[in-house]
Amino acid sequence: MASNIGYDVAGGQFDAMIPGGGVGIFNGCANILGYMRGAQFGGLLSDCENEKGNSGNDEEIYTKRKQCLSKSCNSQFADKYQAKLGCLFLANFLEAAGNPMHTYKEVKCPSVLKDRY
């Protein structure tokens, strides 16, 4: 299990280790099971932002980035089904958002996670 907040994100943001995303300033998960691919900051999403654009609220740019990320997820994790699902979660459910703002609250770590690690 890893916890990562490098204090290089804004208030209301935190780092979540998702296959296809980056590992942030403290890259403790960089080599775990080969799930972290792409740039240290932003992972495959950063690669797509650099390729397709990363500015403005242009719906076309967002669509191109999501398509790029989905394609990268499917190719980079073709043989790692669970990692591919995590990466596609970043692309589809999280709308390929790099550092989105969230409303969240701290909760006690569930025993199912503590028992696993």
Q: What does each model-found stretch correspond to?
A:
Residues 1-117:
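Mature exported/compartmentalized surface modules and terminal targeting/interaction regions
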